[in-house]
Regions:
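Short, charged amphipathic alpha-helical "coupling" segments at sensory-output junctions
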Residues: 632-635
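Membrane-embedded helix-loop-helix hairpins and adjacent transmembrane boundary segments
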Residues: 1-587
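Intracellular, membrane-proximal regulatory regions of polytopic membrane proteins
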Residues: 555-628
Length: 635
């Protein structure tokens, strides 16, 4: 059996192992035997989804090219979990009390359950994650090619582009099977979390094993390794203070705004107290992941031939010394890093697309007289999530093809970080400032996103691909102040720092300025009070009044989304809560609040609010709720 066939078998076997682990975890949770799944250490290991193929392969290449600058990628998350864990706790509490399913759902819920804002946040998340998906495809494709050599060019793979296509297809198939079995996105995915925890251990063990081999097997011990580091060009790199600060900020922002991080950190959180454990255990994990980066980079530069790709030193160093077993472990570690990121990111993005794009379109068709069979709604949501997963992987593959797949892994990752960070002002502002408005959030996010697109994403394809060489040199439309990498005539800056500075500063300034000029709607004010004072009002949501709904109508609507058994169980429990016989409660405001929160786990807060409002016929915020907001504002 050729080495390429061995790699295929190993990958399939590893995926099968993940399926078994996930299946056993789901069965244990279904039987109520999931106390070990709720361990704070399992939660901490799930946060390792931050460490993708970029940190497994690309950190070494980053160190070889830029010295200690690679540490900024670990420093940002460390500062967040150590210094800002109280903010993470608030974020988790908001997610639980509002039944938030994604970053877009959080933004939508905070700003008056605006689906327009949710749609835009979803587009930002999808487009911002696309380079990151391409990064995973590139890393897996490069590792296949390096390991298998000439065998990787045989049909049906042909070349790296064809190989990337098959990798994308396989990851899409795996993710669809893995992550779309449950409709309620707010339910805990015990199987997925357990599989991520296993992958966290695998990639850490693989990287440490390679590091030990490099230090004691190739460099001659710790003292000899330190001497090599001192003599290496890596020690001569002098990082720019501006770039160092910018990258640290970017990695911290990405830790909060990456869709996959929000999924595991907020949606999958079982207990807020787990954040205390994560505040020291996760930085320890990051330290171990970064411990051997410089030694591997230094020894790789010394032993590997000139022109060798430093992004692959973790794999090619063992191969060059005939250590196929260690190289296979390294390959599995890199494959594990890529698959875990793709699975969780695709799950999170597909939830956003189905909740904030597909379901609103369905509601619009229904309102305009379209015919939709009641029993098809669950199928529509699940199908849309599966198609979205395939679409996300297709976008990643398209970016890989257009960009040529030749950029350094770290460069691709930083482009993605900068795009997803545009959500940060609206997110943090909404958590701590009642005066933040939907208009402010939309204005800031739109300006920041388009500046990132113009200054960083489109130029990443190269001159003449998307933006013409004339645009690079003379500016858009011949306007010199609209050059992508010298905006407003500012020249001489690092392109990444330039794009981040303009996009984030104008995003934040416009968010604040427009919020000060506009007035929030009553629902925005109510949601703002719930978010800012979440620890005082964790259980409350917006009120309902003025409705004319019948319980039967609400039951029919709930069955379309939740399914018959779950909807009947929920309605019966609510009827019992009201002291009524049977399974139809009175449509009082408290019941409608809980029904909306229940539905939001499946279709998102904005769509759930719209569906209940549509069924009610007319819905407004109650006077009592407005008085409560006024009282809180006065305090």
């Amino acid at each position: 059996m050729g080495i390429f066939n061995v790699l295929i078998v190993v990958c399939l076997g590893y995926v099968a192992l993940l399926f078994i682990v996930a299946f056993m975890a789901e069965r244990a949770a279904a039987r109520g035997q999931s106390s070990w799944l709720r361990s704070p250490f399992i939660y901490t290991l799930s946060l390792s989804i931050y460490c993708t193929a970029w940190t497994f392969y690309g950190a070494v290449g980053y160190a070889a090219r830029s010295g200690l600058e690679y540490l900024t990628i670990y420093l940002g998350p460390t500062l967040v979990v150590v210094g800002w864990w109280w903010m993470l706790r608030k974020l988790v509490r908001i997610g639980r009390s509002q039944r938030i399913t994604s970053v877009a759902d959080l933004i939508s819920s905070r700003y008056g359950k605006s689906n327009t804002l949710a749609v835009f946040a979803t587009l930002v998340a999808v487009i911002g994650t696309t380079p990151y998906i391409a990064l995973q495809l590139q890393s897996v494709t490069l590792s296949f090619s390096s390991f298998a050599g000439v065998e990787a060019t045989v049909p049906p793979f042909g070349d790296r582009n064809a190989m990337a296509f098959w990798v994308a297809g396989g990851l899409a198939f795996f993710t669809i099977l893995f992550g779309t079995r449950n409709l309620d996105a707010n339910e805990r995915h015990h199987g997925v979390v357990m599989a991520i925890a296993l992958e966290a251990v695998v990639k850490l063990v693989a990287l440490i094993a390679v590091g030990i081999f490099v230090i004691w097997g190739l460099a001659g011990g710790i003292e000899a390794t330190l001497a090599k580091i001192d003599a290496s060009p890596i020690g001569t790199f002098t990082p720019s203070a501006g770039r160092w600060a910018g990258l640290t900020f970017l990695s911290a922002a990405a830790f909060l705004t990456l869709p996959r991080m929000f999924q595991v950190m907020v949606v999958e959180n079982e207990d807020e107290r787990h954040l205390r454990t994560a505040s020291w255990a996760f930085p320890t994990y990051l330290m171990l992941m970064s411990l051997f980066v410089v030694p591997i980079a230094v020894v790789g530069l010394e032993l590997m031939p000139a022109g060798a790709n430093p992004d692959l030193f973790v794999l090619t160093l063992p191969l060059s010394q005939g250590r196929e077993g260690l190289a296979m472990l390294s390959f599995i570690g890199g494959f594990s890093s890529a698959t875990s990121m793709v699975i969780v990111a695709a799950i999170a993005l597909s939830t956003m697309v189905s909740n904030h794009i597909v379901m609103p379109i369905w509601l619009w068709l229904k309102e305009d007289g379209g015919t939709v069979v009641s029993g098809d709604v669950r199928g529509i949501v699940l199908l849309s999530r599966r198609v979205s997963i395939a679409g996300v992987l297709a976008l990643g593959y398209l970016y890989y093809r257009i960009s040529g797949g030749g950029a350094a892994l770290a460069a691709i990752g930083l482009i993605s970080f900068a795009g997803l960070a545009q959500v940060l002002p609206a997110m943090v502002g909404g958590m701590f400032w009642r005066g933040a408005t939907r208009a402010g959030a939309m204005s800031g996010l739109a300006v920041g996103f388009f500046l990132w697109l113009f200054c960083l994403l489109l130029p990443s394809f190269g001159e003449g691909v998307v933006l013409s060489a004339e645009t690079f040199q003379n500016g858009l439309g011949g306007l010199a102040w609209l050059r992508p990498q010298a905006l407003f005539g500012i020249t001489g800056m690092d392109p990444l720092v330039h794009a981040v500075m303009w996009s984030m500063s104008l995003n934040t300034l416009l968010f604040i300025f427009v919020s000060l000029l506009t007035f929030p709607s009553p629902l925005e004010r109510l949601q703002g009070a719930q978010f800012v004072n979440v620890f005082q009002h964790s259980g409350a949501t917006q009120g309902w009044s003025g409705g004319v709904a019948q319980s039967e109508d609400l039951m029919v609507m709930a069955q379309r989304i939740l399914g018959g058994p779950e909807a009947q169980s929920f309605f019966q429990a609510e009827a019992t809560r009201q002291g009524l016989a049977g399974f139809l409660p009175e449509p009082i405001p408290d019941f409608l609040q809980r029904l909306e929160r229940k539905l939001s786990g499946s279709v998102g807060s904005a769509t759930a609010h719209a569906m209940v409002a549509q069924t009610m016929g007319r819905a407004t915020v109650s006077v009592d709720d407005l008085l409560r907001v006024a009282d809180e504002t006065a305090q």
